[in-house]
Amino acid sequence: MDILERTFKKLTRLKDNLQDLSQEEAYEVFRAILEGKLSDIKTTAFLTAMRIKGETSEELLGVIKAIKERMNFPQKKEDALDLGLNYDGKNRTIYILPSALWLCSRLGVEFTNHYALGAPTKEGVTLYEVVKELGVDMNVSFVDQKNYAPELYKLMPLRRELGFRSLINTVEKFLNPFQTKKIVVSIFHKPYFDKNAELLELLGIEDYTIIKGLEGGIEPLPDRPTLVKKRGKDIESIEPKSLGLEMPKDVHSENVLRDSLEINRKIIDGRERGEFFNWALYTAGVLLYAAGECESVEEGVGRVEKEST
């Protein structure tokens, strides 16, 4: 029995008897998927079984190794902060991240982001789309998944057809094609803090920050506490009221791209200095903290605010 047969046998049991895979087994299965050696039916079975079982950090690491072996790496940007955002974007709330990036860029902070358009399950608006339409330099480098990981990108139609968040939604945030030393990643649920921290340690990332933000992203929630975990520290609860800044009460949107462009253009042009500008300051403070440019979010907000006056 070869490793693929043995691995699938582990994943074709009843739910209570599903067995975790070794890092090597996860690597071999996903390598076979990327090489087109597994049918869509077997690929679907693998992704579904892993979804039901729940992935371990070792399994995710094996999948990442299989992907990275076949990646096309752009120019290395070791000192930048990689924005490991959920690839499926946003479909319910306004982006404030572009204004925050613009504010941080004035302090010389560099960012990277990798993305794919139309990624499941939300198939929402990506940061890239908003920044591209704004046409303003924010010191951020982008790379499309279809260019840096074409074999992975070929799975997109199957992922859309499946219609659920698979392990690919998790691992693609950690691929770090620009090979930065610093990463900030987003999560949807609090239990993922520990698993993501363990995975980042296994990947050897020198400095990482994990954020449970708006729509599972890295933007801090304007109306309630945001949970943040920095490497080597406990989970922090950042309360917007503690910053002494009035935040917007409602950031929902029926047209994310249109409304995001409108708000961010006003901030960048200097026409908005109210609640949304304050939210941009808050988000920029979080980014500076994640980039290791300050010791706390509060300090980061103060630095950005001083630069903006």
Swiss-Prot record:
Database matches in SUPFAM superfamilies: Nucleoside phosphorylase/phosphoribosyltransferase catalytic domain, Nucleoside phosphorylase/phosphoribosyltransferase N-terminal domain
InterPro entries: Anthranilate_Pribosyl_Tfrase, Glycosyl_Trfase_fam3, Glycosyl_Trfase_fam3_N_dom, Glycosyl_Trfase_fam3_N_dom_sf, Nuc_phospho_transferase
Pfam family membership, one: Glycos_trans_3N
GO aspect biological process, one term: L-tryptophan biosynthetic process
GO terms of molecular function: anthranilate phosphoribosyltransferase activity
Record GO cellular component, one term: cytosol
The keyword Cell membrane appears for this protein: no
Disulfide linkage: none
Gene3D superfamilies documented for this protein: Nucleoside phosphorylase/phosphoribosyltransferase catalytic domain, Transferase, Pyrimidine Nucleoside Phosphorylase, Chain C
Keywords noted in UniProt: Glycosyltransferase, Transferase
Keyword NADP: no
Family indicated by similarity: Belongs to the anthranilate phosphoribosyltransferase family.
Protein name listed in UniProt: Uncharacterized protein aq_209
Lineage of the organism: Bacteria, Pseudomonadati, Aquificota, Aquificia, Aquificales
